[in-house]
């Protein structure tokens, strides 16, 4: 992970059709070395915001910059630095988990014959998917698909991770492993934006908590709750 730039939003607005804006004139930045936790009820705009940051949707108005890059004008360069966990199981069912991670490494020019296989094995073992590494993703349960998504997000050592409900469907051990991966990622200078209804495990990592409420214009930002040491 060489690039350590901020994500900067300027007047970001997204509406669908003639409806009210889901995201309305949002300006803020996300710094490297930090995790921002997105919270709020269903329909408040968390997934829409993550889709905008991941260039899976385009703004009605406003911009998102990663360093000097307008991410919607130059998506390829930006997305080379991004790891994603999607809201839905959007993984190719005709690949195995092992093949998926190898494809990501090769497509981002991070593959080497010496280190690639061991990196994949270690990461799949970390998320407790190593025994199913050679099975097609189309045969996976929802929990196994989620494990594959988490592994895919981290395998190419991204500078940014964008995660929509990363702990959903995970067993306790894999949930803890995912939190540990996020902690190490942020400590190494990574930038993480995470939406989750399961906030308790993530709040200790959060530099900031961004609350999106039912009203499209109701966006507040606050520091996370302080946690005392045991």
Predicted regions located by residue number:
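Helix-to-loop junction immediately C-terminal to a conserved catalytic motif
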Residues: 54
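Conserved ABC transporter NBD signature motif
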Residues: 62-73, 78
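Catalytic Walker B motif of ABC-type/P-loop ATPase nucleotide-binding domains
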Residues: 161-165
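The feature captures the beta-strand-to-loop junction immediately N-terminal to the Walker
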Residues: 39-41
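Conserved ABC ATPase "signature" region
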Residues: 102, 106, 114-132
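A short, flexible loop at the N-terminus of ABC-type nucleotide-binding domains that lies
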Residues: 1-25, 75
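Q-loop/switch helix immediately C-terminal to the Walker
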Residues: 95-109
């Amino acid at each position: 992970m060489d690039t350590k730039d901020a994500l900067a939003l300027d007047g970001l607005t997204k509406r669908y059709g003639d409806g009210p804006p889901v995201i309305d004139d949002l300006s803020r930045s996300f710094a490297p070395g930090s995790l921002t936790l997105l919270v709020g009820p269903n329909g408040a705009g968390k997934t829409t915001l993550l889709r905008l940051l991941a260039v899976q949707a385009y703004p009605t108005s406003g911009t998102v910059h990663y360093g000097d890059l307008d991410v919607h004008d130059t998506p390829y360069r930006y997305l080379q630095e991004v790891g994603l966990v999607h809201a839905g199981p959007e993984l190719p069912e005709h690949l195995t988990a092992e093949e998926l991670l190898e494809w990501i490494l090769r497509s981002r020019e991070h593959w080497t014959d010496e280190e690639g296989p061991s990196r994949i094995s270690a990461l799949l073992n970390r998320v407790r998917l190593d025994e199913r590494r050679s099975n097609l993703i189309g045969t996976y349960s929802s929990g196994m698909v989620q494990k594959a998504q988490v592994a895919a997000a981290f395998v190419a050592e991204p500078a940014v991770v964008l995660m929509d409900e990363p702990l959903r469907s995970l067993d306790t051990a894999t949930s803890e492993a995912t939190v540990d991966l996020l902690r190490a990622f942020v400590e190494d200078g990574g930038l993480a934006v995470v939406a989750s209804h399961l906030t308790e495990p993530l709040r200790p990592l959060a530099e900031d908590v961004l609350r999106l409420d039912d009203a499209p214009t109701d966006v507040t930002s606050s520091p996370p709750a302080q946690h005392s040491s045991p």
